């Protein structure tokens, strides 16, 4: 009998916008749906966390001083709900069963997050999209991804981004940037390394949860990673 695999995939909100830089690009939704469908076909249980940066970022909204940081973060949480509903529609259009669970109660749109209910959905082959972050300001959607992964007992978190992994410095600015295939949690928390915020990585470290950073636009990438091929991405784990 094949061993059950359960993963949490984190998508950035900006990635949904494509070249537009804002809003939601339908072609990207369709691509995400096709990639997730392949995982479900291979008996992999999938949870998803999506950012809201294609609509608004709490930190950016609060920069001018008019909007408080807490209110900015609340606005960001609502943005993730918009994205979660969009992903739900795309996944359902591809024939998958999907549930959106929000950390903030909004019964007209989605379920309220309950850990045990989320686990049951996953066991039944449904995709669960976790929205509204942790429900608290000052916590990123990266931290949300790690938290939900720990709660649902996921085997790994895959951070699907617009780049193929982690570098020792910004490859867009430095031609000599070195690609890092494997990092420890402590290395991932160094100032020059941009994987996730320190709160997220510390939580992953405490729970020995691997984090894989990969290019979300590489067809078949998610399935390859879960099946053990991490040659074209970066993985953060215990040494």
Swiss-Prot record:
Positions annotated to bind UMP: 52, 73, 134-141
EC number: 2.7.4.22
UniProt note on regulation of activity: Allosterically activated by GTP. Inhibited by UTP.
UniProt binding sites for ATP: 10-13, 53, 57, 161, 167, 170
Subcellular location, principal: cytoplasm
Gene3D superfamilies named among the record's database cross-references: Acetylglutamate kinase-like
Keywords, in A-Z order: Allosteric enzyme, ATP-binding, Cytoplasm, Kinase, Nucleotide-binding, Pyrimidine biosynthesis, Transferase
Signal peptide region: none
Cellular-component GO terms for this entry: cytosol
UniProt superkingdom: Bacteria
GO molecular function, one term: UMP kinase activity
The protein's annotated pathway: Pyrimidine metabolism; CTP biosynthesis via de novo pathway; UDP from UMP (UMPK route): step 1/1
Catalyzed reaction equations: UMP + ATP = UDP + ADP
Localization per record: Cytoplasm
Similarity section: Belongs to the UMP kinase family.
Function: Catalyzes the reversible phosphorylation of UMP to UDP.
Assembly: Homohexamer.
Classification via HAMAP family: PyrH_B
Listed name of the protein: Uridylate kinase
Lineage: Bacteria, Pseudomonadati, Campylobacterota, Epsilonproteobacteria, Campylobacterales
């Amino acid at each position: 009998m094949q061993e059950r695999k359960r993963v949490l995939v984190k998508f950035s909100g900006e990635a949904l916008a494509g070249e537009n830089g804002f809003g939601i690009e339908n072609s990207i939704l369709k691509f995400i749906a096709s990639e997730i469908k392949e995982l479900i076909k291979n008996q992999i249980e999938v949870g998803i966390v999506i950012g809201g940066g294609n609509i608004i970022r709490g930190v950016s909204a609060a920069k001018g001083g008019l909007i408080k940081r807490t209110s900015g973060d609340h606005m960001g949480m609502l943005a993730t709900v918009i994205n979660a509903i969009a992903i739900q529609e795309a996944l359902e259009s591809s024939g998958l069963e999907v549930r959106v669970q929000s950390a903030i109660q909004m019964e007209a749109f989605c379920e309220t997050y309950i850990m045990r209910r989320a686990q049951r959905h996953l066991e039944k082959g449904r995709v669960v999209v976790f929205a509204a972050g942790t429900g608290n300001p000052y916590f990123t959607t990266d931290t949300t991804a790690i938290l939900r992964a720990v709660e649902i007992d996921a085997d790994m978190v895959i951070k699907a981004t617009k780049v193929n992994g982690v570098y020792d410095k910004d490859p867009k600015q430095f031609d000599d940037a070195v690609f890092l295939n494997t990092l420890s949690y402590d290395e991932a928390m160094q100032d020059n390394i941009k994987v996730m915020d320190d709160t997220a990585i510390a939580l992953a470290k405490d729970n020995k949860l691997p984090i894989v950073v990969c290019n979300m636009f590489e067809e078949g990438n998610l399935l390859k990673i879960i099946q053990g091929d991490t040659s074209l991405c970066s993985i953060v784990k215990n040494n």
